[in-house]
Swiss-Prot record:
One of its GO terms (cellular component) is cytoplasm. Pathway: Amino-acid degradation; L-histidine degradation into L-glutamate; N-formimidoyl-L-glutamate from L-histidine: step 1/3. It catalyses: L-histidine = trans-urocanate + NH4(+). This is Histidine ammonia-lyase. Coiled coil: none annotated. It comes from Pseudomonas fluorescens (strain SBW25).
């Protein structure tokens, strides 16, 4: 696997870099420009302690216990106790890729110099990242305010020599994991435990994974939709640039252009029916630019929110070293992330819903002008009959999963934290939705290629022929019924490799 080398200038991560960090290991170096601000924030914390001033998160308790002053001799124990007590997550461990993304996001935030955390602690996180040592972070346990406390506590445990981490696929006790990275357990100073735990990095990583998978699905859906247009002898007219310019919706305009690029001006298939008597295609064909354009807009808007959050300081309290102030606020509240994830859920659901309708269209011989269920000798053979049912089941699941999470809230911490974002749940359900939509698109890809193969050897456009060839290298034509599930799985696995992304125009999607 390739390793991305990254000189991190705090607050300047791009979406393309974030995608690369998620997809492959990274060798991280913190730019020298970060040092002065980091040291200034630490000096500010030390000055507050030297002057015996009371400051939340530095020498007080936390949450509802914020008014409790902590004695100087207990400050180190306070930070350690905070990490241990807050490591209360449950569920399966998240993937190495997600842990890596979380850790880089945390380093990026802490290195902005508003957190009062020593360079030594930040460097320890970087050493773990570079050694590909990934702390055990359970999937569940955060409500997205006050930050992602439980999962980030699990991440931080390893720095203290507690918990466990994965290295080359094997779980190690924390002390052994630290040795792999050339580290020994840390003793956290005042403010440092809270700085590690407070923040929206897990929520943001969950949503970023949803964005990346959503973008890949979008690209795949464009190709599959184009193949279906050709398979059912659809018209190119609805993709005419003048239609979309008249409306002015940028996502729609760009999606229509992508379809025109995929379909080309004409093909053997389109020439075969240019004098037909059809007036209009069904909406699932004709309105693809409108529906997919709206989805593209959601991804683009979510990307804008998430790249800001990936570079944000979401700690609390914040240290403003120049003024000598430590101020409590609410940057840990992940509402922007939750809403971005909710909007992406709508887009992922609609991509699948539209695809399922195109599959259904291909099943109907009156609409498609193809054999019923895309197979010869109907009756003996059932063809794609139940594959379409599977697609319908997946589309239906996504409709329920698309329910917004950001409108939900449960008060926590004895009502001190009385409104929360539910951003982690909003983000992680995107992965299940993406898997469902990938399954739907897999069925459409299979069906559209089958339909084209039934068109007596006629060829479509060069790009769509490439999409057909990629599938046909793995899955053969259906001349009669066979065990169907392996073919759906094969097509879905192909989609997961992002093999159709290269067929869409560059810069169409935010992180590609």
């Amino acid at each position: 696997m390739n390793v991305t080398a990254l000189n991190l200038i705090p607050g300047q991560l791009s979406l393309a870099q974030l995608r690369a960090i998620y997809q492959q290991p990274v060798t991280l170096r913190l730019d020298d420009s970060a040092t002065a601000q980091i040291e200034a924030s630490v000096a500010c914390v030390e000055q507050i302690l030297a002057e015996n001033r009371t400051a939340y998160g530095i020498n007080t308790g936390f949450g509802l216990l914020a008014s409790t002053r902590i004695a100087s001799e207990d400050l180190e124990n306070l930070q350690r106790s905070l990490v241990l007590s807050h490591a209360a997550g449950v569920g399966e461990p998240i993937s190495d890729a997600l842990v890596r993304l979380v850790m880089v996001l945390k380093v990026n935030s802490l290195s902005r110099g508003f957190s009062g955390i020593r360079r030594q602690v930040i460097d320890a996180l970087i050493a773990l990242i570079n050694a590909e040592v990934y702390p055990h972070i359970p999937l569940k346990g955060s409500v997205g305010a006050s930050g992602d406390l439980a999962p980030l506590a699990h991440m931080s445990l390893v720095l203290l020599g507690e918990g466990k981490a994965r290295y080359k696929g094997e779980w190690l006790e924390a002390t052994e994991a630290l040795k792999v990275a050339g580290l020994t357990p840390l003793t956290l100073a005042a403010k440092e435990g809270l700085a590690l735990l407070n923040g929206t990095q897990v929520s943001t990583a969950y949503a970023l994974r949803g964005l990346f998978e959503g973008e890949d699905l979008f690209a795949g859906a464009l190709a599959c939709g184009g193949l279906t247009v050709e398979a059912v002898l659809g018209s190119r007219s609805p993709f005419d640039a003048r239609i979309h310019a008249a409306r002015g919706q940028r996502g729609q305009i760009d999606s229509a252009a992508a379809y025109r690029d995929l379909l080309g001006e004409s093909s053997q298939v389109s020439q075969s029916h240019q004098n037909c008597d059809k007036v209009q295609d069904p909406y699932s064909l004709r309105c693809q630019p409108q529906v997919m354009g709206a989805c593209l807009t959601q991804f683009r808007q979510a990307a804008e929110v998430l790249v800001v959050e990936a570079n944000a300081v979401s700690d609390n309290p914040l240290v403003f070293a120049a003024e000598g102030d430590v101020i409590s606020g609410g940057n840990f509240h992940a509402e922007p992330v939750a809403m971005a994830a909710d909007n992406m859920a709508l887009a992922i659901a609609e991509i699948g819903s539209l695809s399922e309708r195109r599959i259904s269209l291909m099943m109907d011989k009156h609409m498609s002008q193809l054999p019923p269920f895309l197979v010869g000798n109907g009756g003996v053979n059932s063809g794609f009959m139940i594959a379409q049912v599977t697609a319908a089941a997946l589309a239906s699941e996504n409709k329920a999963l698309a329910h917004p999470h950001s409108v939900d809230s449960l008060p926590t911490s004895a009502n001190q934290e009385d409104h929360v974002s539910m951003a982690p749940a909003a983000g992680k359900r995107l992965w299940e939705m993406a898997e469902n939509t990938r399954g739907i698109l897999a069925v459409e890809w299979l069906a559209a290629c089958q339909g084209l193969d039934l068109r007596e050897g006629l060829k479509t456009s060069p790009k769509l022929e490439k999409a057909r060839g990629i599938l046909r290298d793995k899955v053969a034509f259906y001349d009669k019924d066979r065990f169907f599930a392996p073919d759906i799985n094969a097509a879905s696995e192909l989609l997961a490799t992002r093999c159709l992304n290269e067929l869409v125009p560059a810069n169409l999607l935010p992180s590609l």
